[in-house]
Amino acid sequence: IYDFAILLALYTGLRIGELCALQWGEIFNGRIYVSKTMQRIRMNSGKTEVVVTPPKTDKSNRCVPIPSFLLPIVERFKMQSGYVIRQDNGNFVEPRLMQIKFSQRIKAYGIRQTHFHTLRHTFATRCIESGMDAKTLSEILGHSDVKTTLNKYVHSSFELKQTSIDKLPFVYAI
C-alpha cells in the first residue's frame, strides 16, 4: 500500500496530509475530491494527537484528475469505503508513519534520503516540463496564487532550459 501511496502522490501532487486523510468515497469518475487533511498536533497536555481538519485554504478544496494510466492501479486497490491508505488492520496511516515508510522505501531502492513533500515538487516540475500551464497546475496543487506554484514548486532543469532555447526560431544569417 505504501508504494501505491507514493505513486498516487507522485502523479497527483497531493500533500501528505491530504493523501492520508483521503477516503474511497472521495475518489470517483477518475477524480480525487480533496476536502480535508490529516495532521499531528500538540495538545495542551503536551501530548500529540492525529486530527483530520479542512485543508489549509479554500483553494485547497479541489478536484484533482487522476492520470488515465493510473486508473487501473487505483481500481486494483479500491475498497467500498474507508481510508485509501490504510494499515493492514484497517486503521489510517498518519503522515508521520507515511514519511517513515517513504524513507524506508527510498533507502531500499538506493535513492538518497528526502522528504515525502519532494514528490509534490517533482510532480509540479514534471507537469511544467510536459507543457501544462502554470494556472492549471496551481489549481491542481490547491495554491491560492500561481506565484507560489512557480517560485516554490517548479524547479527548472538544464534539459528544460535547452529544450526551451532550442524552440527559438533561427533568424540570424551567419
Describe the role of every protein-language-model region.
Residues 3-5, 34, 42-45, 74-75, ...:
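Extended hydrophobic-aromatic, low-complexity segments
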Residues 20-21, 138:
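Short, surface-exposed helix/turn micro-motifs that flank interaction/cofactor sites
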Residues 21-76:
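Conserved tyrosine-mediated DNA breakage-rejoining catalytic core shared by Y-recombinases
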